[in-house]
Amino acid sequence: MNMFVDQIKIEVHAGKGGDGMVAFRREKYVPNGGPAGGDGGRGGSIILKVDEGLRTLMDFRYHRIFKAKNGGNGMSKQMTGPSAEDTIIAVPQGTTVRDLDTGKIIGDLVEKDQELVVAKGGRGGRGNIHFASAKNPAPEIAENGEPGEDHYLELELKMLADVGLIGFPSVGKSTLLSVVTGAKPKIAAYEFTTLTPNLGMVMLPDGRDFAMADMPGLIEGASKGIGLGLKFLRHIERTRVLLHLVDMSSEDPHQAIERYRQINKELADYDPELLKRPQIVVATKMDLPNSADNLAAFKADLAADKTLEKQPEIFPISAVTHQGVQQLMQLTADLLDKTPAFDSESHDKELVAEYRAAAPDKKDEADFTITKDEDGTWVLGGEKLIRLFKMTDLTHEESQLRFARQLRHMGVDDALRAKGVQDGDLVRIEKFVFEFIQ
């Protein structure tokens, strides 16, 4: 079964930077050669990239955790470790990316081959060549690689189509799509046959073409989530022209106008801007009995509606006999020629911000936090402090002393004293425990 998946949650973990190296030159004719430890390589980033061949988020159903590789460690003779390759994740055109931690939309992937960095790889740690000084010409200090970014994301697919087919269930949307595009949607004589959007390309004899999407039937309350409404109303947002199909074969001559108004109400309740889209009213099933009389009643009901600023254009067709179908496609193409393309820059412009995966904003970042465990151990945390800790090579005493100086400079020692920490109290940073000494 070709299941349509249009919303999924994933984890992305960028690679850690490679560790810097502590090394010294050992050459026959170079006495006191000095430090020669190289830097670590950059960790791999996680990048989402538009793949026009994809139509759903189905590939993410069983693969939701993505990890990039770590950078290579620095080497002797001042050689830098290799940087890791970025991990490229293919997504369908029309994918919106939301950060689940902040709730913000961080990217909208609508262009061909568009890329979005969603987790930046850590930079490589510096080797000991960077820490040489007049006072310490042979430092045994090197940095560990910076941790890569971790993010929890929600991907939401809004199908990109030039034309959207809307209407109540079983008005003939799937039949029309199959006739004009060659697509093979599931078609049957009962409601809700279409449970997923179907997409096809219309190719006209004059060389023009456009993408057409068959949206599952809407019902009353769709804008409030009844039926499949909310799930598929989002796909209509990006269509440029709407073909509103109305079934003319009912025994009730006034059913057509009631359903026409109901669909427009659901569109308005979901997003009033949708009613501003160019809309062609398509009277379907004109080959069946009662259809001609019902069409006349439908036109009369519209003419009597004083709330309409403009009478909609009505185009009768029969998808089964192909009556009027080619002319409808020509009319649709003409309307598309006059309708601007979907503007991803302006759509939700106040909500969408291109995510640049930059370093954290130092103004908003808490330098450190101090808490106390039930066993009496003091616990240091905070994004900046933890990042410094992870980049400290604790296997070398000089690196430990440098980290202690960094903590003192950040004000951690004074803050611990203010909290009442005494000599000999245990202090923990992640799994590393040490004694506090005044």
Curated annotation (Swiss-Prot):
Binding site for GTP: 167-174, 192-196, 214-217, 284-287, 318-320
Coiled-coil residue spans: none
A GO biological process held by the record: ribosome biogenesis
EC numbers: 3.6.5.-
Enzyme class: hydrolase
Domain of life: Bacteria
Keyword GTP-binding: yes
A GO cellular-component term linked to this record: cytoplasm
UniProt keyword annotations, A-Z: Cytoplasm, GTP-binding, Hydrolase, Magnesium, Metal-binding, Nucleotide-binding
Primary location class: cytoplasm
Alphabetized GO MF terms: GTP binding; GTPase activity; magnesium ion binding
Its biological purpose: An essential GTPase which binds GTP, GDP and possibly (p)ppGpp with moderate affinity, with high nucleotide exchange rates and a fairly low GTP hydrolysis rate. Plays a role in control of the cell cycle, stress response, ribosome biogenesis and in those bacteria that undergo differentiation, in morphogenesis control.
Family named by the database record: Belongs to the TRAFAC class OBG-HflX-like GTPase superfamily. OBG GTPase family.
Record protein name field: GTPase Obg
Organism of this sequence: Limosilactobacillus reuteri (strain DSM 20016)
